Amino acid sequence: MGQKVNPNGLRLGINRNWESRWVAKDNRQTALWLVQDDKIRKHIFKVCKAAQVSHVEIERTQNKVDIFIHCSQPGIVLGKEMSNLKVLKQQLSYIVGRKTKVNVNVLPLDKPTFSARIIAREIADAIENRFSFRNAQKIAIKKVLASGAKGIKTNVSGRLGGVEMAREEGYSEGIVPLTTLRANIDYALEEAWTTYGLIGVKVWINRGELFKKNFSQNTKFEKKPIEKKREQQPVQQQKPQQPKPQPKVVKEVKQEEPAKPVKAESLKREQEVLKVVEAKPAEGAKKGKVEETAIIMISTKKEYADNLLNEDLNKNVFFYKVTPVNPIKRVLIYTTTGKKGVVGEFDLDKIEILAVSTAWRKYGQQSCMSKKDFDEYYKDSEKAHILISKEAFRYSRPKTLESYNMKKGPSGFQYLK
């Protein structure tokens, strides 16, 4: 009988990487590290259940463990002033041993609905809360397809609805080619604990194809006749012939395609993004302009600006690293107003000290705040410290600070376009 293989294991080394990456000394250390990795993952999925963890990657050396937690709500894992992250590090150090250094990196997901584990966990939670298993699957399927997935397949099995005989039921929409190795398919299995028994939830999500086809199945190959080998004749000396003049090759000039018309709204948006902000250069620096990559922030107190220069980030901002595949110097969550925040990278270049009124007159046109909010925020301050960056990139749209588990902005930094 044909059986369905795990799509994650089938694609390892083709379009998917191992989630545990290390090299052990001997068989004894291999067994020890395998058990530790399993305990680490089970503990993280249990403690960080509210953060919707998709998967956990582990990289090891002999004296260090790097753990990368991919989740949809990183603020819950980090906690207020990194309190939850410190507790999690301490708990994980008991698993791997105190002599081994533990580094925990929290990474946000671009599209949480593309994660099969998150969707399977949502269906399992709905079943545990006595929600209809059919409606739970249909809602999850609509959510995944609306986010741009190519297809999804769900399956629940057990005593569905509390009946005496166990059975299984599932739904499928879109394209889910399990045997096509170039298809990026994510698979997860979760369990729903109910009063009448255990119910298993399986989810397959097709994110799209990673490689294109080189040729179609209908391609026809022409058969060429095999030429017989001719007998070699003795070489006769011939007079050298003069090379014939070759005709000049005239290249055809391709006609350029007419440019597509650009909408006025998109053009205006591009101009705003690529806006050049004039800034006062530091002493001894060359005169020039700070481009849009130089994002500017204004601080109410000098100590907050000094903390950024000294890289004492724990006192004023929340931050987390990213994977070594996409190295980033500093990823922060900084405020756009007193109620919203943005995830992004900020590499500080210099600080310019101005009066509050001068700071608004010089940089207020690029601010996301209104003049009323600006005056209310800086009413007790005389000077403002303008932080100008070398490079800065925004990785999310402005969100409420509650989604980052924050009630106040990190030390009063304000984001300016």
Swiss-Prot record:
GO cellular component, one term: cytosolic small ribosomal subunit
Domain KH type-2: residue ranges: 40-110
Gene Ontology biological-process entries: translation
Matching PANTHER family: 30S/40S RIBOSOMAL PROTEIN S3, SMALL RIBOSOMAL SUBUNIT PROTEIN US3C
InterPro entries per record: KH_dom-like_a/b (IPR015946), KH_dom_type_2 (IPR004044), KH_sf_prok-type (IPR009019), Ribosomal_S3_C_sf (IPR036419), Ribosomal_uS3_bac-typ (IPR005704), Ribosomal_uS3_C (IPR001351)
Region called Insert, residue ranges: 250-417
Biased composition (Basic and acidic residues): 221-232, 249-264
Protein name: Small ribosomal subunit protein uS3
UniProt superkingdom: Bacteria
Subunit structure: Part of the 30S ribosomal subunit. Forms a tight complex with proteins S10 and S14.
Function (record text): Binds the lower part of the 30S subunit head. Binds mRNA in the 70S ribosome, positioning it for translation.
MF-aspect GO terms: mRNA binding; rRNA binding; structural constituent of ribosome
HAMAP family attached to this UniProt entry: Ribosomal_uS3_B
Sorted UniProt keywords: Ribonucleoprotein, Ribosomal protein, RNA-binding, rRNA-binding
Pfam family name, one: Ribosomal_S3_C
Residues covered by region (Disordered): 221-264
Ribosomal protein among keywords: yes
Family note: Belongs to the universal ribosomal protein uS3 family.
Claim: Ribosomal protein is one of the keywords in the record: yes
Source species: Malacoplasma penetrans (strain HF-2)
